[in-house]
Amino acid sequence: MVASNNMKGLRAFISDLRSLEHDDEEKRVNVELAKIRAKFQSSTLSAYDRKKYVSKLLYIYMLGYPITFGHMEAAKLLSGTKYSEKLIGYLAVALLLNENHELMKLVINSIKKDLLSHDSLQNSLALHTIANIGGRELCETVYYDIYKLLMSASNENIVRQKSALALLHIYRKFPDLINPEWFEPIVMILGDDDLNVSLAVSNFVNLIVIREPKYQKFAYGKAVGKLKNIVFEHGYSSDYLYYSVPCPWLQVNLCRILLACERPSDNPTRATLIRVLDRILSLPNDNSNVQQVNAVNAILFEAIKLAFLVDESHSLYEKCMDRLADMIADKESNIRYLAFETTAYLISCGHSITSLKHYKELILSSLRYKDVSLRKKSLELLYMMCDEENAKLIVADLLQYLPHLDSVTQEDLISKVAIISETFATDYEWYVDVTIQLLRIAGKSADDGVWHQLVHVIVNNEEIQEYATKRLFSLLQSETIHECLVKAGGYVLGEFGHLITDYPDSQPVHQFSTIYRKLNVSSPSTRVLLLTTLIKLANLQPELNDRIAKVFQEYSTIINPEVQQRACEYLQLLKMPRDFLQLVCDEVPPFLDGNRDGVHPKSRPSSKVNLVDTYPQTIPNVSKPSTPIDVPEYDISACLPGFYRLCWKDKGILYQDSQIQIGVRSEYHNSEGAIYLYYENRQSNTLKSLSSTLIRTFSTFHLATTFQDTNLPSGVQLQQKYVMSGVNEIFEPPIIHVSYVTGVIRSIDLQLPVLLSKFMKPTIFDSYDFFNHWGQMGVEREAQLTFGLNSKDRKLDAKRLTKIVSGFHWGICQNVDSIALNIVGAGIIRFGTQNVGCLLRIEPNYEQNLIRLSIRSTNTSIANTLAKEMQEILRNSF
């Protein structure tokens, strides 16, 4: 708390409060608040008293008590003649007000007056307040004055430093206020002789080069020059040495600026930077001094990232690897965490870190650290290090560690191992073994999606059905097994139990007794599934019908309504004709890839037959299920083939039948677009009362022109036009309802091929620039999906895949990825008032017809939306 030494009342008040218990403290605070309120109402209140009482209010506020008065008195202190009054006034304004407070309008003039003052202390107080709570109105009033303070060489350096930070606040919140002509002069200040000013401006420059790429070349030269001045020319005084390390924060910021910039075209600048990085990577690190170690490592981490980007000759590769290896092996957990993070960053940028794979055991050992963040980061790094060569080894190691981990880390590990085993599986038996081991060791930490996917793979791959059924049945016979394995085993045994009846101890009677034992100790949801297993067993093994009927009879009186209902229904099924039971219990068909995430046995029918349609007799004493059936709001299924095709083509047929054909033509330019619909009568009779109604839309999508005549003669076309004036929100494709009369009223819902990607402007990067931007966006701004095609009969085709990606308005970047089959793209979407950069990486697996889609963007919501859109279109376009 800032207080003048002569405010004895304040000091006494603070001393009193510190000596009191909570209840007594609250009473004392309430007494003081009443006293202060009375004093503020006095007409003889002096400036000194106002300062003292506002200080008391601030202290009370900092203790956590609400302050509902005194704001005006605090604002009056800004007009005081003494520095101490202004100091308390600005502190009160910063703490008690926010940018939308009604009193902010009253303090704007005082702040502007102090900015124009020739007193550097008053300038500093005003700049502090702007940088902390500057709202739109305040920033509009003072932004030019702040710029003048920054650019004036006659001002004290402390004022210029604070001006840079205040201007950065304005640029972050209200970029439209900053004149683009100011950027180059601001970048120039990066080379200022005062390192504090350079440090303050460096944050601003970093944001400029990210938002305004055209200034990157200029900023690159300035940053390299300043870094060289510090490293080689000792352009600093002893005041800027932090434990013998020269201005480490500025060095870190300069490296980050260079990371954000494009690679320079002039070789001298690049050569200078490589020499500077070589010197930095050779810095000694005195392990006896923690502060020095932290400062040096902060610089090293940024220098290593930068070296990988600019050193095409790889002359610094060994030094980078040696320094990273030392930090990975460091005993200090913070250093090890940052080393893991840096290594993960390099991998995400496509760089090779082969030599660090020798430290796999060391990284694995971090999974047992007490620090949860280190455990999470080490697991993330191991996941990213996986490739076709080492996937099985890493999975085996992770499975060894799995039993010894806490539940949170187990859950994360299970998820990652499941993805690795599916992505890099060379044979499905290995995948089945790994997934079963995951569920056996840590089933309680596993998401249901893990065993759902196991069932999916088994059902869809005939060659492993016998092997998987035998493995799961063997586990079902053990006494202690987690319920997720019971569910998976029960499901698979019901479908494929007949495949293992020739094995010893796997005869139908053994299968029945095993399932019955598990029924008695399982949860209601598992019991429901196991009852389904028994009805399927009864279908294939008629000799067990009596035993199974007794089980159904037993569970038909159980208290749980869902289990009871299922038992009653299955008991009635056993009494029906044999051919009907066979029809109902037909083997489950292969799952479509589109449902791979939803293979829940309860939510999917085990037969292609509807019981009601097939056997209309009523079943006594069986109630209807209480769970409602979800009915889609719109039925757009008829237009989906055309919709999927037009999402990556500019024109074509959206829908047609024997009566009407509806075509589409799209035009997009930057952030605006138009979509034309063509209605054509395909029959000899006139279509009457043709209408088209927009039933789902978004804010900038609206009808521009439409047909006037609602009658459509044979062979005639009618046109309709919709326009899009930019995009400022995440949206779903619009849907129109089309109706017409041909003797009877006919109608159809059509989903229009308007996606977020349609507003993208294609961009081309070389390898350096792509992975530079890819790394800057980071894993946290990435949307990644792995999926297959919706039809098993379809095959991925490289040419068609590239054509579809290009049709999504991505700029295809050639010779960027080290794997030639991968597709890399870039684009920019004008979203509201911002240009949002987007990067794409597609890793197709043509043998298994799988696609791994990764999209990074400066806007995470846009990355997620683009990924979901592309997933749906790609899986339905082959």
Curated annotation (Swiss-Prot):
Keyword Cell membrane in annotation: yes
Gene Ontology MF terms: clathrin adaptor activity
Pfam annotation, one family: Alpha_adaptinC2
S-adenosyl-L-methionine in keyword set: no
Family annotation (Gene3D superfamilies): 2.60.40.1230, Leucine-rich Repeat Variant, TATA-Binding Protein
Membrane topology recorded in Swiss-Prot or TrEMBL: Peripheral membrane protein
Gene Ontology terms describing biological process: clathrin-dependent endocytosis; intracellular protein transport
GO CC list: AP-2 adaptor complex; cell cortex; cell cortex of cell tip; cell division site; clathrin-coated pit; cytosol; nucleus
Stored InterPro entries: Adaptor_Complx_Large_Subunit, AP2_complex_asu, ARM-like, ARM-type_fold, Clathrin/coatomer_adapt-like_N, Clathrin_a-adaptin_app_sub_C, Clathrin_a/b/g-adaptin_app_Ig, Clathrin_app_Ig-like_sf
Keyword field: Cell membrane, Coated pit, Endocytosis, Membrane, Protein transport, Transport
Compartments in which it is found: Cell membrane; Membrane, Coated pit
Family of the protein in this entry: Belongs to the adaptor complexes large subunit family.
Role, per record: Adaptins are components of the adaptor complexes which link clathrin to receptors in coated vesicles. Clathrin-associated protein complexes are believed to interact with the cytoplasmic tails of membrane proteins, leading to their selection and concentration. Alpha adaptin is a subunit of the plasma membrane adaptor.
Quaternary structure (record): Adaptor protein complex 2 (AP-2) is a heterotetramer composed of two large adaptins (alpha-type subunit apl3 and beta-type subunit apl1), a medium chain (mu-type subunit apm4) and a small adaptin (sigma-type subunit aps2).
Name of the protein in question: AP-2 complex subunit alpha
Organism, scientific name: Schizosaccharomyces pombe (strain 972 / ATCC 24843) (Fission yeast)
Gene: apl3
